[in-house]
Amino acid sequence: MRMKETLTEIFQNKIVDILLVAVILWIGVFIINRLVQLFFKRTDFIEEKKEKTIESLVRSVTQYTATIGFIFYVISLFVHDFGKILAGAGVAGIVIGFGAQSLIKDVLAGVFLIYERQLHKGDYVTVNNLFNGTVEEIGLRSLQIREWSGKLLTISNGEVRQIENYNIDFMRITESFLISFKEDPDRVYSVLEEACDMLNEELRDSLKRDEFGNPTEPFQIHGITALNKINRGVEFTVKGMVKDDDYFSASLAVRRVLVRQLYQNNVQMLEEAVRIERTQ
């Protein structure tokens, strides 16, 4: 009976220790993350996107470190000489013994992903030519992307093979459209030049500029990019370079202005007629 009471007392004391350590670790993680947030909020050393990326990384590192440390602590309470076993087996052997090769792969991939600055939190990306969305979280093991529909995707860093980033300094907008053979090319050029002038005025704050404040590549007619395309018409292309953050909104504005100008000047675009014959 006394032995049972002794074991119960020891077990209860360990439970108290476990809860105490869990609370301390939770508070420590919270304080570290909070300090990082306050530091970036009160300073302006780096860009906002990079600040959010670092915050995401610190949050991931502290959570993983606290969790692993807590697990080792709990095991050490119930396994005698766990520290000696850990030192003798080696950390690498224990990790492999737990079958965590995929974890190592994901963590290493995450480190290189962040170190090489392939993306930042808030960037719009395409991953592996399959997933499109805005980067919400960059962790040591996984990457979270929010699709336009609102769906949140979590991708293991080790599975990321290709990244297309739409938020690296600038983006070039190119719009191509087919005009009827019946239209005078010179008249089409004149209408498009007027449309480009309107775009450069309307989107002046979105244009990518050089160190002197001049537009790097204002909206202009790229030229006739195809003749007799698919036996239907002549292809004209308009292009311009904008800031990466304004790419999607600027693209919508470009299409709106071009369509409006072509319509107001009665420039005939292609129409596809479908002929249906009935047999008696």
Curated annotation (Swiss-Prot):
Where does the record say this protein resides?
Answer: Cell membrane
- In terms of superkingdom, the source organism counts as Bacteria
Molecular function in Gene Ontology: mechanosensitive monoatomic ion channel activity
Q: Where are the transmembrane segments?
A: 15-35, 68-88, 94-114
Induction cue: Induced by high salt concentrations.
Q: Which SUPFAM superfamilies match?
A: Mechanosensitive channel protein MscS (YggB), transmembrane region (SSF82861), Sm-like ribonucleoproteins (SSF50182)
The record's section on Pfam families has: MS_channel_2nd (PF00924)
Topology versus the membrane: Multi-pass membrane protein
What happens without the gene? Cells lacking this gene grow normally in minimal medium or in high-osmolarity environments, and exhibit the same survival capacity as the wild-type strain upon a drastic osmotic downshift. They sporulate and germinate normally.
Query: Which coarse location class applies to the principal site listed for this UniProt protein?
Result: membrane
GO CC, alphabetical: plasma membrane
**Keywords for this entry?**
Cell membrane, Membrane, Transmembrane, Transmembrane helix
Per the similarity annotation, which family is this?
Answer: Belongs to the MscS (TC 1.A.23) family.
What role is this protein assigned? May play a role in resistance to osmotic downshock.
Name listed for the protein in its UniProt record: Uncharacterized MscS family protein YfkC
Q: Which gene encodes it?
A: yfkC
